[in-house]
């Protein structure tokens, strides 16, 4: 039997083999909100006899003892990529670089240096490379790394630009999808940052049409709340590199009880119940006071929230108290974001309040040392991603702190219990901040005048 691989693996199976392959690439995912499992299918019919499965699932044919002739029509686009100026760490990055020779996932915690390793692999494979990012901020971070380590200007797709001439091109996923057909056979290597999003429609659209010879997925977590991580192998195969945790400091979790109830009334939409918490004066005052406390202790504090009005209210109050503040939200211009990050890195203690969607993934501002989660979070991977923003090692930086706010009521306590399980699983120290401990901390921050 002949199997042709390009963007997918195309073949002519008999009914028995196709029934097996079809079942093995069909997933039934249980959800909390649906009475029945949701079905996802990652195989299909091209014509009466021609079927397709993911390239990375040829193991299904091997499992049935099928002998086949492989015709590889994937894109190879050799280019000269300059040798990068960085040096890989021998204890964790270099072994992966030496072993990696095909499509795979690199599952490294924040601080591991996934960006550097991926750029090294782009150099190793020597193929015209496309880096796909979740947003423009991360895209600009990748572009800056290419300039810094390779000494050339990368191509950019997005923000009104379409330059695919350089050997490395960086784009955000939304723009790539618009040009998917034209780009499907241009690149020999595709690197997908924050690959845990890859089973979302916006990512699968391009991955399913791309004929790139090498596909590399990067992520700090391979967990998804919806369970769709079972499909990762259909896009990046079974090879997963999970390096040990290095180059980071484990945070200490300071847990504060907030006298605000999170309603458990299922008849009220979640967004409205969350709004009741976010709009509560006690909740807002708690975040303001804690941000003021930790900045006075010398921290560079990051507050994340998914409510712009809450971010702006908190920053206004802190500014009135004389605290140096910064804001990064969706409306913040890209150049302004970069300038803010530069000012924070060079400056003293401050508070940065930012949109959670921007800072939950990939933004590297290593000088941040304290995280205040200003949203109601009950998602293991999101907690780990956010905590990673303050875990990176920088000379002179204070030991990282993550501030956990515990709401009243059964729902609030259940969420707090879920977050506590994440902290335990990661081996992070937790401290319950009783009123007495909070007073002691305030005396350290503000002196006896507090």
UniProtKB/Swiss-Prot annotation:
Span of domain Helicase C-terminal: 289-439
GO molecular function, one term: four-way junction helicase activity
Positions annotated to bind ATP: 108-115
PROSITE patterns according to UniProt: HELICASE_ATP_BIND_1, HELICASE_CTER
Keywords in alphabetical order: ATP-binding, DNA-binding, Early protein, Helicase, Hydrolase, Nucleotide-binding
InterPro entries registered for this protein in UniProt: ATP-dep_DNA_Helicase (IPR050615), Helicase/UvrB_N (IPR006935), Helicase_ATP-bd (IPR014001), Helicase_C-like (IPR001650), P-loop_NTPase (IPR027417)
Keyword ATP-binding found: yes
Domain Helicase ATP-binding: 95-240
Record-linked SMART domains: DEXDc, HELICc
Up-regulation conditions: Expressed in the early phase of the viral replicative cycle.
Any Pfam family: Helicase_C
Lipid metabolism listed as a keyword: no
Protein name: Probable helicase D10
Organism annotation: Escherichia phage T5
Gene name of the encoded protein: D10
């Amino acid at each position: 039997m002949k199997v042709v691989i390009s963007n997918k693996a195309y073949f002519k199976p008999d009914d028995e083999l196709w029934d097996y392959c079809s079942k093995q690439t069909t997933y039934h995912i249980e959800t909390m909100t649906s009475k029945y499992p949701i079905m996802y299918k990652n195989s299909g019919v091209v014509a009466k006899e021609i079927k397709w499965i993911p390239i990375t699932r040829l193991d299904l044919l091997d499992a049935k003892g099928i002998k086949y002739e492989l015709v590889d029509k994937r894109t190879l686009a050799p280019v000269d990529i300059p040798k990068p100026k960085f040096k890989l760490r021998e204890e964790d990055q270099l072994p992966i670089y030496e072993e990696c020779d095909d499509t795979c996932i690199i599952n490294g915690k924040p601080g591991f240096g996934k960006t550097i390793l991926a750029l090294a692999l782009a150099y190793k494979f020597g193929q015209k490379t496309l880096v796909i990012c979740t947003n423009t901020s991360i895209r600009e971070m990748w572009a800056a790394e290419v300039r810094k380590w390779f000494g050339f200007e990368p191509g950019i797709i997005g923000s009104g630009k379409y330059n695919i001439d350089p050997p490395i091109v960086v784009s955000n996923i939304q723009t790539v999808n618009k040009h998917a057909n034209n780009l499907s056979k241009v690149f020999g290597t595709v690197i997908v940052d924050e690959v845990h999003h890859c089973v979302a429609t916006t990512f699968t659209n391009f991955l399913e049409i791309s004929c790139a010879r090498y596909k590399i997925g990067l992520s700090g977590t391979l967990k998804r709340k919806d369970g769709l991580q079972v499909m990762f192998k259909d896009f990046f195969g079974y090879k997963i590199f999970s390096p040990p945790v290095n180059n980071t400091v484990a945070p200490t979790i300071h847990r504060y009880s907030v006298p605000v109830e999170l309603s458990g009334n299922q008849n009220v939409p979640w967004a409205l119940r969350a709004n009741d918490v976010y709009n509560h004066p006690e909740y807002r005052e708690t975040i303001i006071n804690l941000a003021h406390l930790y900045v006075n202790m010398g921290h560079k504090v990051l507050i994340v929230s998914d409510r712009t009005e809450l971010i702006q209210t908190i920053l206004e109050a802190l500014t009135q108290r004389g605290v140096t503040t910064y804001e990064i939200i969706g409306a913040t211009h890209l150049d302004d974001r970069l300038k803010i990050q530069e000012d924070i890195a060079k400056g003293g203690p401050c508070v940065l309040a930012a949109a959670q969607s921007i800072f939950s993934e990939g933004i590297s501002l290593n000088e941040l040392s304290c995280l205040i989660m200003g949203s109601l979070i009950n998602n293991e991977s999101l907690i780990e991603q956010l905590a990673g923003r303050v875990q990176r090692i920088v000379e002179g930086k204070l030991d990282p702190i993550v501030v956990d706010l515990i709401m009243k009521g059964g729902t609030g306590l259940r969420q707090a219990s879920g977050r506590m399980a994440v902290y335990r699983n990661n081996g992070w120290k937790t401290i319950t901040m009783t009123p007495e401990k909070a007073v002691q901390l305030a005396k350290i921050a503000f002196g006896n005048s507090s």
